[in-house]
Amino acid sequence: MRKIITALAFVFVAISANAETFEERAAPCLACHGEKGQSETENTPSLGAQQAPYALIQLFMFREKLRVFEPMNEMAKPLTDDDLRTFSDFIAKLPKPAPSADAGDPARMARAQALAQQHRCNSCHNPDFSGKENVPRIANQREDYLAKTLGEYKDNSRHGYDGSMADVMGPVTAEQIADLAYFIARVR
């Protein structure tokens, strides 16, 4: 899988250098992150309706290798500051990801909702988990990506702008991370 993503990164760089329209430049992004902003690629986030300021910062961090994930670092490398703004605005205008058709197990959903309230997820990410400004939209994000990301915050292998996510995730167990990911992926 990693080889495929790396190959796509090189294709993106080649296409971007020769692309004439923005749609042509965005096509490789949508190949992994979903044509309509809803990813079907394992452990790859859906970008639809993501907050533009958040997307801008993430793209900048990838370009500057402040956030390291090689395919994204390679793809962001040739982007100018204007390109970063254009891409982040484009991402924000994609349709928001649809909730899973599976509404989820009611007991597990209630348990995870209580956990989300206990850890004040709704304070930063909004009560509907739509995000705001430089706080990401997490509502209806891919469950596998949510679990992976929350686990990375817990073990400090992923860093945010400050230590708040690591602080929040510190006491959360692996089982609770799975429940939170399950809930947020299905929130209505």
Identify the function of each model-found stretch.
Residues I5, F10-N18:
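Hydrophobic h-region of N-terminal signal peptides that target proteins for export
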Residues N18-K36, P99-P127, R142:
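Sequence/structural segment immediately N-terminal to covalent heme-attachment motifs in c-type
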Residues G37-R67, N73-L79, Q113, Q117, ...:
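Gly/Gly-Pro-rich "capping" loops immediately C-terminal to redox-active cysteine motifs
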Residues Q38-S39, V68, K93-A107, D128-P136, ...:
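Inter-heme linker and motif-flanking segments adjacent to c-type heme-binding CXXCH motifs
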Residues K77-P99, D144, G170-R188:
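C-terminal capping alpha-helices of c-type cytochrome domains
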